[in-house]
């Protein structure tokens, strides 16, 4: 490889890492701002209303780029993506954060990369080494142990804890299917088409929620809702997928490990929440398990570095 080519590759990797970090930064604020929004707004309105707003932006993007329509098989797969990242994760985190703190939720969300890898492995029919499964189960056990020992109901899972676990499971499924579909449609178009596909349902639920609980909120709650709509549900995906395309999934994907740490930080700085030592300890254990799943999968020859992410 020539010196000029090496420099070009290096610049691409640097740009990818920067974009990936920007995406993680955007997503790390989702839980704190959801917590702010649901203090004044109905959680169903927050969850589905943000998708409605993002779908308007998605329609504009698809029209401007003249994106071709997905085929029938791709529409079915987009339904899985929509169920996970457009509906499932926003809904269950919104419901959970009406009673739980963002810092508490951050520990649960820390296991998301490992659960995404598990769904990706199952979907692809891969056979990773035993360490992969042990680390994945270990991360989940660490999260459940944390919830049972520190939740509102000692010795049992509270309702908010169940919502958080459902949010992680559905989001992981959506990420895994979306990652595979992005190789065909492109990352930006994948999330945009998922938003468009879900728009009739999200619009109906948003309207019903607005009628049932007329949205009256403070300026801060509306600002948080605007962030969730424009950034968490739309622009954050653009930066994240662009970073993966430029810098490679193996390199840029590691940045996601910083997301729960940043969320804990924002929870303390922006919301004044107390981050207990148990939360920090649990997050460290979960992140260690996530690292083990990624390395075990890579050593088994099934790592994400083999995936080609479209630049579209």
Regions found by a protein language model. Name each.
Residues 47-49, 86, 90, 104-111, ...:
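Helix-helix packing/entry segments at the starts of transmembrane helices
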Residues 25-31, 59-109, 145, 229-247:
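Specific transmembrane alpha-helical segments of multi-pass solute transporters/efflux pumps
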Residues 58, 79-81, 119, 128-150, ...:
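Hydrophobic transmembrane alpha-helices of multi-pass small-molecule transport proteins
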Residues 14-19, 45-60, 64, 80, ...:
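Hydrophobic alpha-helical transmembrane segments of multi-pass integral membrane proteins
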Residues 1-50, 54, 95, 153-180, ...:
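Glycine-/small-residue-enriched transmembrane alpha-helix faces in small-molecule transporters
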Residues 2-9, 49-51, 148-149, 221-223, ...:
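C-terminal-most transmembrane helix of multi-pass membrane proteins
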Residues 57-69, 112-134, 261-280:
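C-terminal transmembrane-helix exit sites in multi-pass transporters
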Residues 37, 46, 50, 96, ...:
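Hydrophobic/aromatic residues within transmembrane alpha-helices
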